[in-house]
């Protein structure tokens, strides 16, 4: 038979089995994907950057219009502000994902969103700056710096700026952006009437809300409700919301010169000869006065390259009439107003003031309107509020202030940075550490409780916005001490024991040496693991570096920590809502949320497997009910979890209606052996997880299991120790 040249499309594993648990997010952005290599240290390189030289280069670039993409009003500042805003503005507090921390706006999905049309041009305009400074300046930092410098160049007294955002070199697939099948739809996220978590945007492909109004309906009051919902979900209050919208819309314009039918595909779908640029517009020239971005033709101010209160003045003082843009979209024009707004390219042409439905929301919502009037009457207060809100918008996923770099880091510290007291005492030494371990192990707290409490404290960390973690011991403070998964009644007793040990130790010291509760919680886990390893025949030291401090209650952003209370935690075998499991949708299952949490903890697949196996045999599971504790020697650090999970002499059967709980029976005796959840069984069911589990179940890898578990434990315990990385 003659061979035929292939013309059919390749089908990937995910095409055949779309509901298979995907581990890809645990493998993305490894050191091998970074072209600078594993020895490259951006945080070291950026400290050698001449920031002032970059700022001057940016100011010059902003006022040098390029023929291939001409600048509105002769200034790219408004475009760069939009780029910075949309890079940072996709952040949401529920999982800390999105945001500006890694420059992922350069990649799908975000670069292809309809809300980000033509931001690919803004990034290309910045390429000469990036090219000049190379490895000393990341795209992530440059994108935020460009918008901040633009504000400064157009009259805003900025609060400050920090460097320190490290680039990724591949698309970030960890965020769940929604289940909608088409852009600018919100059907799935509002399926049950309320916006599902973790979403902040009200429609697919937007960073906040539809500027035309809810689902395109020009209803300012309805728009205000959506704005409040979206901005609250990204951690902004009402005053910050008004300041950001009014400040941001002081600059630039919306573009909708012609019909959307002439707009080409997004960057990822565009023809190869366009070199990664998308949205080619074939209406007239397709640029300058003929540009299409949002479909609206709106200029808010008569001075669109200068900061001021004119946006607020026009918004509140004019009456507004509904009209259609050239693309047929709903927008508003000032009633009986003169043509006073300059054209971005024709000096002989003027326009009437225009607004979006989302702008009028600030006028018709009683709370927003009151704030807007206050800002109009107090311009200096408005400018300060905008500068502070901009700083929060562009920095809130960078973590604590100790992560900030550069000459323009502000002195102020903010509650959203998880501030900590400055240590004013000497740290404990090796002799003290051994003494305190003995005190903890003899305190009456068992191994399971010690490990569970330490893990509960440290695993609150999430790398998406570098919040949470063991430093500060916020687990002992509201609201984390009330989280169901943290065993509140048990936790308060354990903390009291630690406080007694702390008090006795500190009072015994003749010098200024002290120990914090935060350090004791982690040390307790380390001591318990050493004891458990010794029972298994391994005399091994668990790394511990003191230096954590104890946060005060007023250093806890309570609203934030209430919002992020977990409803699922596979590491501790906790799942609040088993009735929501739908096996036809993997994203509803606890094993899906386990992978999601593992990514936030920066765990690889082997690290995920080994840490779960160790936590199980140590009995560190929710309510200590022994689900997943596949061993007869609880508190001994063995590989029993994997051995028994992979034992073909055990048959597993569902024991609840939700298919969450299972029981393992001896195939011969029919007697029950163990209980487990879906999270446990996934390590034998999923082929890739099983492949790793088989390594740790092997007879010759018992020591490797202990060693790898301790390495992973130490990694999680120190994820938030930025003081060690400075």
UniProtKB/Swiss-Prot annotation:
Keywords: Heme, Hydrogen peroxide, Iron, Metal-binding, Oxidoreductase, Peroxidase. It catalyses: H2O2 + AH2 = A + 2 H2O; 2 H2O2 = O2 + 2 H2O. The keyword ATP-binding does not apply. There is a cross-link at residues 85-208 (Tryptophyl-tyrosyl-methioninium (Trp-Tyr) (with M-234)). Formation of the three residue Trp-Tyr-Met cross-link is important for the catalase, but not the peroxidase activity of the enzyme. PROSITE patterns: PEROXIDASE_1, PEROXIDASE_2, PEROXIDASE_4. PANTHER family: CATALASE-PEROXIDASE, HYDROPEROXIDASE I, BIFUNCTIONAL CATALASE-PEROXIDASE. This is Catalase-peroxidase. The gene is katG.
């Amino acid at each position: 038979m003659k061979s035929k040249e292939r013309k059919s499309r390749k089908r990937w594993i995910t095409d055949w089995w779309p509901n298979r648990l995907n581990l890809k997010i645990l493998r993305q952005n490894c050191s091998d994907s970074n072209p600078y290599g594993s020895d490259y240290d951006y945080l070291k390189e950026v400290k050698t950057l001449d920031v002032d030289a970059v700022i001057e280069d940016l100011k010059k670039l902003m006022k040098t219009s390029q023929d291939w993409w001409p600048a509105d009003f002769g200034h790219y500042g408004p475009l760069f502000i939009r780029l910075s805003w949309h890079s940072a503005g996709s952040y949401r507090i529920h999982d800390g994902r999105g945001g500006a921390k890694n420059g992922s706006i350069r990649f799908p999905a975000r670069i292809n969103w309809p809300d980000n049309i033509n931001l690919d041009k803004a990034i290309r305009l910045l390429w000469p700056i990036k090219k000049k400074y190379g490895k000393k300046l990341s795209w992530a930092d440059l994108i935020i710096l460009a918008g901040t410098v633009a504000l400064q160049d157009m009259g805003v007294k900025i609060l400050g700026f920090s460097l320190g955002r490290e680039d990724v070199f591949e698309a970030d697939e960890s965020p769940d952006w929604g289940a909608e099948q088409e852009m600018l739809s919100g059907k799935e996220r509002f399926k049950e009437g309320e916006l599902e978590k973790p979403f902040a945007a009200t429609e697919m492909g937007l960073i906040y809300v539809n500027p035309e109004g809810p689902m395109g309906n020009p209803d300012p009051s309805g728009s205000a409700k959506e704005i409040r919902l979206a901005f609250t979900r990204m951690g902004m209050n009402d005053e910050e919301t008004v300041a950001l919208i009014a400040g941001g819309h002081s600059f630039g314009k919306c573009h909708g010169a012609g019909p959307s039918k002439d707009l080409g595909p997004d960057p990822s779908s565009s023809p190869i000869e366009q070199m990664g640029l998308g949205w080619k517009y074939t209406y007239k020239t397709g640029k300058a006065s003929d540009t299409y971005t949002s479909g609206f033709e709106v200029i808010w101010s008569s001075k669109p390259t200068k900061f001021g209160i004119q946006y607020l003045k026009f918004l509140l003082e004019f009456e507004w009439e509904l009209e259609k843009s050239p693309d047929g979209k709903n927008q508003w024009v000032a009633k009986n107003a003169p043509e006073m707004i300059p054209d971005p390219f024709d000096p002989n042409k003027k326009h009437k003031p225009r607004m979006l439905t989302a702008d009028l929301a600030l006028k018709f919502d009683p709370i927003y309107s009151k704030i807007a009037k206050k800002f109009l009457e107090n311009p200096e207060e408005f400018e300060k509020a905008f500068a502070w809100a901009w700083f929060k918008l562009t920095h809130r996923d960078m973590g604590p202030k100790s992560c900030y770099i550069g000459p323009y880091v502000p002195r102020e510290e903010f509650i959203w940075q998880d501030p900590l007291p400055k240590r004013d005492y000497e740290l404990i030494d090796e002799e003290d550490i051994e003494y305190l371990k003995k005190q903890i192990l003899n305190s009456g707290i068992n191994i399971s409780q010690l490990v569970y409490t330490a893990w509960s404290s440290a695993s609150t960390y999430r790398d998406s916005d570098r919040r949470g973690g063991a430093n500060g011991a916020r687990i002992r403070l509201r609201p984390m001490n009330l989280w169901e998964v943290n065993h509140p009644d048990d936790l308060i007793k354990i903390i009291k024991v630690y406080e007694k040990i702390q008090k006795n130790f500190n009072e015994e010291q003749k010098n200024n040496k002290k120990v914090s509760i935060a350090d004791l919680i982690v040390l307790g886990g380390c001591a318990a693991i050493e004891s458990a390893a010794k029972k298994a025949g391994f005399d091994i030291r668990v790394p511990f570096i003191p230096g954590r401090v104890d946060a005060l209650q007023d250093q806890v952003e309570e609203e934030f920590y209430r919002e992020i209370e977990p409803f699922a935690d596979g590491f501790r075998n906790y799942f609040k809502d088993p009735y929501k499991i739908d096996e036809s949708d993997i994203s509803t299952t606890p094993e899906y949320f386990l992978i999601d949490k593992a990514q936030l903890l920066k765990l690889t697949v082997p690290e995920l497997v080994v840490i779960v196996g160790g936590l199980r045999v140590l009995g560190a599971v929710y309510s200590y009910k022994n689900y997943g504790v596949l061993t007869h020697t609880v508190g001994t650090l063995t590989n029993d979890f994997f051995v028994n999970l992979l034992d073909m002499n055990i048959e597993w059967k569902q024991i609840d209606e939700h298919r969450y709980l299972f029981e393992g029976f001896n195939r011969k005796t029919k007697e029950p052996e163990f209980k487990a959840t879906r999270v446990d069984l996934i390590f034998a069911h999923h082929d890739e997880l099983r492949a790793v589990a088989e390594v740790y179940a092997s007879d010759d890898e018992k020591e490797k299991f202990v060693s790898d578990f301790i390495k992973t434990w130490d990694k999680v315990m120190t994820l938030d120790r930025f003081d060690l990385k400075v």
